[in-house]
């Protein structure tokens, strides 16, 4: 078991496979640092390996909302699994700005990664080029990936059931914030969400 692990994602929107990914990381270390990527427009950049990931329509939630989602979901899951709720923290992680990582995450941690496309391979190359210790938790083809946030957002846009694809805490918050309505209106998240 590693002392400290770093795991990351956009979580736009947080779904059941995100939770499985986060819990897999939590089982591999004593303390988990969850980096939320694309924290704001200034720290978000397109990457040729996945050009759509920086598009505003693919990043509807603010960092604050995603931090609340990740925290609520992990607290709920940790309680259900008998894990220490003090064994994780959540930070911004400007994934496209590796020169800034040291300001956000411990560079001597193990960086957990799932790979299923060119973007995952690009991140592995980026992390290893920085001399980071990388542990690939899963390396599968795109069609074996499973659930995607794009699919969940699409269901929200079309008014189809989506709640069963998200952890209960995430569904509660996204309903409270009317994320489906916000997506249908084509708007970004409200800055006034508590």
How would you describe each model-predicted region?
Residues 1-194:
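Nucleotidyltransferase catalytic core that binds NTPs
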């Amino acid at each position: 078991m590693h002392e400290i692990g770093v795991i990351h994602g956009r979580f736009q929107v947080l779904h059941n496979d995100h939770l499985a990914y986060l819990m897999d990381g939590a089982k591999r270390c004593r303390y988990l640092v969850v980096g939320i990527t694309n924290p704001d427009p200034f720290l978000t950049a397109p990457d040729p390996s996945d050009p759509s990931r920086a598009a505003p329509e693919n990043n509807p939630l603010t960092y604050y909302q995603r931090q609340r989602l990740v925290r609520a979901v992990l607290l709920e899951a940790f309680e259900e699994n008998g894990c220490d709720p003090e064994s994780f923290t959540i930070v911004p992680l400007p994934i496209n700005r590796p020169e800034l990582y040291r300001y956000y995450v411990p560079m001597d941690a193990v960086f957990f990664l799932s790979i299923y496309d060119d973007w995952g391979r690009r991140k592995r190359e980026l992390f290893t080029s920085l001399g980071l210790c990388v542990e690939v938790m899963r390396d599968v083809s795109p069609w074996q990936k499973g659930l995607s946030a794009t699919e969940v957002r699409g269901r929200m846009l079309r008014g189809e059931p989506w709640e069963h694809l998200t952890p209960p805490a995430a569904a509660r918050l996204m309903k409270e914030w009317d994320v489906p309505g916000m997506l249908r209106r084509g708007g970004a998240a409200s800055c006034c969400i508590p």
